[in-house]
Amino acid sequence: MNDRAPHPERSGRVTPDHLTDLASYQAAYAAGTDAADVISDLYARIKEDGENPIWISLLPLESALAMLADAQQRKDKGEALPLFGIPFGVKDNIDVAGLPTTAGCTGFARTPRQHAFVVQRLVDAGAIPIGKTNLDQFATGLNGTRTPFGIPRCVFNENYVSGGSSSGSAVAVANGTVPFSLGTDTAGSGRIPAAFNNLVGLKPTKGLFSGSGLVPAARSLDCISVLAHTVDDALAVARVAAGYDADDAFSRKAGAAALTEKSWPRRFNFGVPAAEHRQFFGDAEAEALFNKAVRKLEEMGGTCISFDYTPFRQAAELLYAGPWVAERLAAIESLADEHPEVLHPVVRDIILSAKRMSAVDTFNGIYRLADLVRAAESTWEKIDVMLLPTAPTIYTVEDMLADPVRLNSNLGFYTNFVNLMDLSAIAVPAGFRTNGLPFGVTFIGRAFEDGAIASLGKAFVEHDLAKGNAATAAPPKDTVAIAVVGAHLSDQPLNHQLTESGGKLRATTRTAPGYALYALRDATPAKPGMLRDQNAVGSIEVEIWDLPVAGFGAFVSEIPAPLGIGTITLEDGSHVKGFLCEPHAIETALDITHYGGWRAYLAAQ
């Protein structure tokens, strides 16, 4: 489930149930919310979830609070901590001091004494790594099922895969537990789960983030990645995480420009694979949503340039069918030789296939890749950015387990070449199928164009919302966007609470499919309650208001049960804070979902 209803015992104060992105955490802390209470409540909520395969291990609460206290002391001394009090998840192939690093394999587990380089940079900025997240074993997979720790599932429909290999990291963000997580992305392991859970997945240029403290999958290609709800959050985290590491031979020096946002010209060229080279494996709705994304980018001033996808596809095939699979064996060779029984059967077969490779195969692969990179140059001479589906389709867990190699390979159709060709990429939401499953696209740029493509991805996600009110194409700085659905709508009884707090109406839009709306019993004034229901048909009308950060915490703290603030997904795939209802309150409420909104229901009375 993507959206959490507020906990009944915690309504009335700002808790993790109200906090979904960096802005909401920062607004709450600025308004006086105690960060220790937020972290403690977060642990309580994880405990309530019970046996959830998101997490492999958790940092003890006492350790998290001690880390927070240290950050508070540094903050009180005037140190700038841009991520103060922000909890995050860490994929369990990245070291967190004191927690076992398993890489999804109990027989591999070891406990490091120090954080990975990137984790340490985030901790230095005040963030709190609360635990290690589930993954496809040794980051070998794009589906999330290759793990002995239970299978994380798509938050929109638990019958479907979450995507991988950064499965737990994606689900931890998508279900609202943490505002961001670290994943990794060698073949698409950060982008695929982002698409399947309606998130942003930022895959930086190789070497922009240090790999020190990362269990290698393919060391020459590995990238630590960021999963978040918004492009702004992904960039904010990336700017902290990025940095040259002299102890990592694959770390690269890059100027601040690599993560600097770019104002795109009114006219630009974007490349898409020629129609005959596109593949959706029978998923007609994914194909339609990609075509819609192309039209949207044209509305934004882009000129669509079709290109020959052949060299990119052939490069992608080298990742597992070529000598680069030997890098996976190099990372765990002694374990694979001495204790092959501890490996997941599918992962074992993939990694041990490297034993068939020779040194000659390796050099032939290097030569072949160089030829393909040269062949791709003619495409890059014509385009400013590439637009691809993040994944051609999505599969059920049952289907993936029945055909794990072929279906997993299908998922990487548009992702596997990116690191081999030294490119940057960011995956963003791009709408929903009629069954409520999300679809995503990826913007791909040259090396160190991370900030530029992120800017375009952000504009893409916000485009539909901007059309709702052309005068406000993006939220003003120092505001938090909040979706209202009932008594806070324009001309409704509680709208004054927004206007008196300095709120400004930005747009009228609709939620993504899969929300139910109920008229609450004995509510004064009359108001509805909305919650996520994957069986609900249609969408719900909402207004988006921009509320000053200074007033956000106070506004939230006055919301009475059974309502609270959680994450709401809009019809364009973007996320905002918005009103959600505790599930128990609908037991005596009237289902008014079929009206499509509160105003339509009132008009019918």
UniProtKB/Swiss-Prot annotation:
Name of the molecule in the record: Allophanate hydrolase
Keywords attached to this entry: Hydrolase, Plasmid
pH-linked activity: Optimum pH is 9.5.
Outcome when changing residue 165 to A: Loss of activity
Subunit structure: Homotetramer.
Pathway: Xenobiotic degradation; atrazine degradation
EC number(s) recorded for this UniProt protein: 3.5.1.54
UniProt note on regulation of activity: Inhibited, in a time-dependent manner, by phenyl phosphorodiamidate, which forms a covalently modified Ser-189.
Top-level taxon of origin: Bacteria
Catalytic activities: urea-1-carboxylate + H2O + 3 H(+) = 2 NH4(+) + 2 CO2
Function of the protein: Hydrolyzes allophanate to NH(3) and CO(2). Can also use malonamate, but with much lower efficiency.
Location of the active site: 91, 165, 189
EC main group: hydrolase
Family: Belongs to the amidase family.
PANTHER family: GLUTAMYL-TRNA(GLN) AMIDOTRANSFERASE, TRANSAMIDASE
Keyword Hydrolase: yes
Organism taxonomic ancestry: Bacteria, Pseudomonadati, Pseudomonadota, Gammaproteobacteria, Pseudomonadales
GO terms of biological process kind: atrazine catabolic process
UniProt GO MF annotations: allophanate hydrolase activity
Keyword Hydrolase: yes
InterPro entries: AH_C, Allophanate_hydrolase, Amidase, Amidase_dom, AS_sf
Gene3D superfamilies: 1.20.58.1700, Amidase signature (AS) domain (3.90.1300.10), Gamma-glutamyl cyclotransferase-like (3.10.490.10)
